[in-house]
From Swiss-Prot:
GO cellular component: AMPA glutamate receptor complex; dendrite; dendritic shaft; endoplasmic reticulum membrane; endoplasmic reticulum-Golgi intermediate compartment membrane; ER to Golgi transport vesicle membrane; glutamatergic synapse; postsynaptic membrane
Disulfide topology: none
Stated role: Regulates the trafficking and gating properties of AMPA-selective glutamate receptors (AMPARs). Promotes their targeting to the cell membrane and synapses and modulates their gating properties by regulating their rates of activation, deactivation and desensitization.
Pfam families xrefs: Cornichon
Highest taxon in the source lineage: Eukaryota
Species per Swiss-Prot/TrEMBL record: Homo sapiens (Human)
Name this protein carries in UniProt: Protein cornichon homolog 3
Length: 160
């Protein structure tokens, strides 16, 4: 039972993947709250409630913006670690999401983007639905990755 760099990579990935799972859950909850605010017809008649609702939407979008770069950075770190550890299968499983993150980051308009989660853009029903589906897909990916990393960590520790 030897401690290798690959085992260290899997251990660190487990901890960071747990953080990514919480990020994905937070995204799902935030988008669900935005969807609920979007469909509340009673509050639209009262200007006081409308201002409060708008502040709530801006607050949620601001918090969502704060989670984008850490998520992309952590996932990029996974790929760099597995590349250095020569864990090719694990790297191959992570590269599609890494490419999606790069595409999402570099193909967003400068003034208003889905990546930045601007309130007018996010409150579009199609964009909100897309973002919510994306969050569910990322949650599924991170959950599967978590258990894969756990298995690989145990296998690496036992086999070496």
């Amino acid at each position: 039972m030897a401690f290798t760099f690959a085992a260290f990579c899997y251990m660190l990935s487990l901890v960071l993947c747990a953080a990514l799972i919480f990020f994905a859950i937070w995204h799902i909850i935030a988008f669900d709250e935005l969807r609920t605010d979007f469909k509340s017809p009673i509050d639209q008649c009262n200007p006081v409630h409308a201002r409060e609702r708008l502040r709530n939407i801006e607050r949620i979008c601001f918090l969502l913006r704060k989670l984008v770069l850490p998520e992309y950075s952590i996932h990029s770190l996974f790929c760099i670690m597995f590349l250095c550890a020569q864990e090719w299968l694990t790297l191959g499983l992570n590269v599609p999401l890494l490419f999606y993150h790069f595409w999402r980051y570099f193909h967003c308009p400068a003034d208003s983007s889905e990546l930045a989660y601007d309130p007018p853009v996010v409150m579009n029903a199609d964009t909100l639905s897309y973002c919510q589906k994306e969050a569910w897909c990322k949650l599924a990916f991170y959950l599967l990755s978590f258990f894969y990393y756990l298995y690989c960590m145990i296998y690496t520790l036992v086999s070496s």
